[in-house]
Amino acid sequence: MQQIFKTTKLAILALVGWGLCFGDSARGQTYTTNVNSAIADGNPVGLVSTTTVSGLTNVISSIQVNLDITGGFNGDLYAYLLGPQGGFAVLLNRVGMSSANPFSYSDAGFNITLSSGAPDLHFYQDVTNTLGGQLTGIWAPDGRNISPGSAPNVFDTAATSANFDLFAGTIPNGDWTLFIADLGSGGGQSTLVSWGLTIVTVPEPQTWMLIAGGFGALLATRRFRK
């Protein structure tokens, strides 16, 4: 009986260890870049910030992006993310712009996480009221790969296909570039405080095998004990 208990305990400890390893992969690696730079008002040249990723051994499963932007006029901003293998996602594209709102949203700033499957960032006022302040929460990237200078009605039906799914299956190592520009004038000064990139990679096949084997060992000891 003592040997059975010892074997079961070892199997459980192994499962915990493997689970922790797998959990780290599922949580991903986060790379934060402090910028603290003004985004020139009404200037399409914009601001570029690059972070370099290295040492990841597997392809991308999913990504998230954090944006901390203060001040300005949210509806003036256009931003995109370029990956090292050519992946491209539109993060912001004149949020709020539509035939019903040709002047877009006038709230000041973002402190948000962009993640696939979350509510549409472009029409965030349909979900929440920031009372003119900084938007918070988790949102899907804008994804509208159209010119930010398009007529307001074009935004009504634009596809949201320039999203984070385009990075899945690509190699994460290399330079990731954030571009952001203020394309309106007179809306005040926006500042990019920081941005973060979280990369979740596909787990190694042996990780799944180890977890499955651990469960098998645990079940076997339980049956033997009975």
Q: Which role fits each region the language model picked out?
A:
Residues Q2-I12, Q206:
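Bacterial N-terminal signal peptides that target proteins for export
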Residues E204-R222:
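A short, hydrophobic C-terminal helix/tail in secreted or cell-surface proteins
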Residues K6, Y31-N34, W208-I211:
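Enriched but not universal
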Residues L13, I171-P172, I211-A212:
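N-terminal hydrophobic alpha-helix used for membrane targeting or insertion
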Residues F22-G28:
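Sec/Tat signal peptide C-region and signal peptidase I cleavage site
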Residues Q29-T201:
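Loop and turn regions of beta-sandwich accessory domains that flank beta-strands and are enriched
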Residues A11-C21, G216:
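Bacterial N-terminal signal peptides
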